Amino acid sequence: MQRKEEKKTNLFSLEGKNAVVTGCATGIGQGLAVGLAKAGAKILAFDIADLSETKQKVEEVGGECQLYHVDLSNSAMIDEIWHLAVEENQHIDILFNNAGMQHRESVLTYPEDVFDRVIAVNLKSAFLMAQKAANHFKERGCRGKIINTASLFSTFGGVDVSGYTCSKGGMLSLTRALSNELAPYGICVNALAPGYILTELTRAVYNNPEKSRPINERIPMGRWGNPDDFEGIAVFLASQASDYITGAMIPVDGGYTAR
């Protein structure tokens, strides 16, 4: 599909764009939201947790952040809040599916209800949000961007994280499937694969020398990542600079998977 509109001088500008970012109350999602805001996007933050810190950080860099409280395991609530966000903002241009949860337990005792919730939050919500975004982009005739947060565990097996691994393997497959179906409409669908990133979810491992030392030794860049390491790649995949990239999963791991 040939791009008919004239290229902007700044390929990375997101001025005038509205970006939905799920799971952005803390950590990686917060870093994504701040990065997009720095490039000019208005952030529509979707999360079940308190988003006040994200709003503050976005506003500190001169951005605008609108908050939507939503349980992403609830499909009816997703539908309601999506339509509210469209109604209040007229258009959405970027979707960042970042919401996720993890439960560590042996597969021998892993509870069915927990498995179902992990899949619902990490994978099913991404499908439902992408479906809504794709229809919205198609109706508007715009080149929308959908970016999914995958993981090292999209290709690794892991231990005691069977639900999470299934959800992240599914996220990679979903990204590829959506990219094939939506490319004819000019919609790009890509994924990020975070490595070991220092967030509240990983702090216990980071602070345990026996666990963190071998991880550091395998990372060529010699350190764990931080949420702000995602700002640049978020802007790239959300902007017209990546208009000929779709179906890709880009590691953000300091070289971990290369080793």
Question: Where are these predicted regions, by residue range?
Answer:
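Canonical Rossmann dinucleotide-binding motif of NAD(H)/NADP(H)-dependent dehydrogenases/reductases
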Residues: 12-44
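Alpha-helical segment proximal to the catalytic Tyr-Lys
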Residues: 135, 180-184, 243
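Active-site helix of classical SDR
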Residues: 130, 167, 175
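Substrate-binding pocket helix/loop in short-chain dehydrogenase/reductase
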Residues: 106-107, 111-119, 215
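Residue(s) in the substrate-gating loop at a strand-loop-helix junction
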Residues: 151
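Conserved glycine-rich Rossmann-like NAD(P)H-binding loop of the short-chain dehydrogenase/reductase
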Residues: 41-53
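C-terminal substrate-recognition "lid" of short-chain dehydrogenase/reductases
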Residues: 223-252, 256-257
